[in-house]
C-alpha cells in the first residue's frame, strides 16, 4: 500500500441481540487498521431485517463501541458524506441500483419456485439440493408476462459470469472459486425487498470502502460479491473492487465456534464482571494477531502503531477466559491509582455497591485492592465489609478462625485497640503487634487471623491494619466484640 492510498474500512453489524466478542474483535481490527494507516473508520448499521432488528440492539452497539473507545469517523449519530448510514434509510438507493442492473442485463427477473427448481434437478438426475439452476436467465418477455398473469412475484437475480472468480485475500492468499460453482443468486425477495448480497456491496461501493475486513464465515459469499462488483462497475455505481481480508473464527469450549449461546461471547457480561476496556481490547487483539512473540500485554496505542492486516493469522483463535482474566488484571495494575479509584467508584455506583467512605478514604481503599483483583467486581468482595448492610461472616472462615482459642486473642486485641488514641494504620499496627505478638507470643497467622475474620468477615481481605482504619474505631471494636462472642458461643458446650 502506498502512502497516497486512502484506506476506508467499515464495521457493519446487524442490530440483533447483544454485541458478541467475535463481532467486536472484527470492529477492533477494522478500527485499528484505519487508525494505523490514517484512514477512515465507517460505522454502518445493516438493519433491513425488520423481523429480527431492534432499537435496543442498535443502542447496545453504540454503547459497546463508546465504552471501548472505538470512535467512528462516519456513521450513526455523527453522519458523513455518504449517509445515511442505516440501511433501512437507504431503500430508494437499492431500488435504483436494481433497476439499473435490470436495464443493463446484468440481472434478471426469476419466477421459478423452489419446488420447480428441485423438480428440474430430479428430472435431470441431479442432486435436488443443488440450489438455483439459472433456468430463468433467458425467459422471453411473453413468458415473463405469463408468469405475472399467474400472480407470481419474481426475485431479481444477478447473472453470474462464466469465469473463475479469484481474489488475493490479505489473510489467506489467493483464493479461487471455479466457473459454474456459484449459481445466479437473488438480490431481492419476491416482494422487492433488497437482500444482504445486494445491499452490502452496494453500500461498500457508494461509501468508497477500500478494504473489507470480516469474519471467515463470510468467505463463501465473496465470489458473489466480486461478480456483483463487476456489474456495479459496468453500470457506473462502483469505481473499483475492495480488497478482502477474512479474519479467523473465534472458538469457544471444545474448539467449537463461539456462539451467542456461550456466556463468554456476550461483551456486556465481561463489562458487568468488571473488565476494563484496555484489558478486553488487549485480549481481543490476540484473537488472530500478535504484536510480538514475547509481548502479550500492550496498550491500544501500541496496537495501532503495529497493526497490519497482513499480519493476521488465518488459523482459528480460541477464546480462553483465564488468559483474558489475566490480561485484564495486568491492565488494572497499570492504571495509576487515581484513575483506578475513579473507575472503581463508577463501577460500584453502577452496581449499587456502597462503602460509606469519603473520596479520600475510597481512594485509599482502592489502592489496597488494586493489585489483588482480576476484574473490578472482585473488589466488592474485598471491600463489602465496609458496608454494614453487606457485612456477613463467611462460614468457612469463621469455622476456621473463630474457635475457642480465638476468645483470648480477640479479648487482647479489643483491650489494646481501646487504648489507641489516633486511629490510624501505624497506631493500630503497633497496638495489635504489641498485644498479640509481643505479649501473647503468637505467630502472625494465629494472632491476626481471628482479628481479620471478625473485622472483615473473611480470611481474604485487604491489609488488616489499613482495613481497620477504614472501618473506623467504633465499628472495628464492635466487630471484634461480636467476633469474640461468636467464638465463645462456638466453644461453649452444646446441649
Swiss-Prot record:
Keywords in alphabetical order: Aminoacyl-tRNA synthetase, ATP-binding, Cytoplasm, Ligase, Nucleotide-binding, Protein biosynthesis
Binding residue positions for ATP: 260
GO cellular component, one term: cytosol
BP GO terms, sorted: glutamyl-tRNA aminoacylation
Subcellular location: Cytoplasm
EC number assigned by the record: 6.1.1.17
Catalytic activity annotation: tRNA(Glu) + L-glutamate + ATP = L-glutamyl-tRNA(Glu) + AMP + diphosphate
Keyword Ribonucleoprotein in record: no
Keyword Cytoplasm: yes
Tree of life domain: Bacteria
Segments carrying motif 'HIGH' region: 13-23
Motif ('KMSKS' region): 257-261
Gene Ontology molecular function, alphabetical: ATP binding; glutamate-tRNA ligase activity; tRNA binding; zinc ion binding
UniProt subunit comment: Monomer.
Family: Belongs to the class-I aminoacyl-tRNA synthetase family. Glutamate--tRNA ligase type 1 subfamily.
Function: Catalyzes the attachment of glutamate to tRNA(Glu) in a two-step reaction: glutamate is first activated by ATP to form Glu-AMP and then transferred to the acceptor end of tRNA(Glu).
Protein name, per record: Glutamate--tRNA ligase
Organism: Mycolicibacterium vanbaalenii (strain DSM 7251 / JCM 13017 / BCRC 16820 / KCTC 9966 / NRRL B-24157 / PYR-1) (Mycobacterium vanbaalenii)
Source species taxonomy: Bacteria, Bacillati, Actinomycetota, Actinomycetes, Mycobacteriales
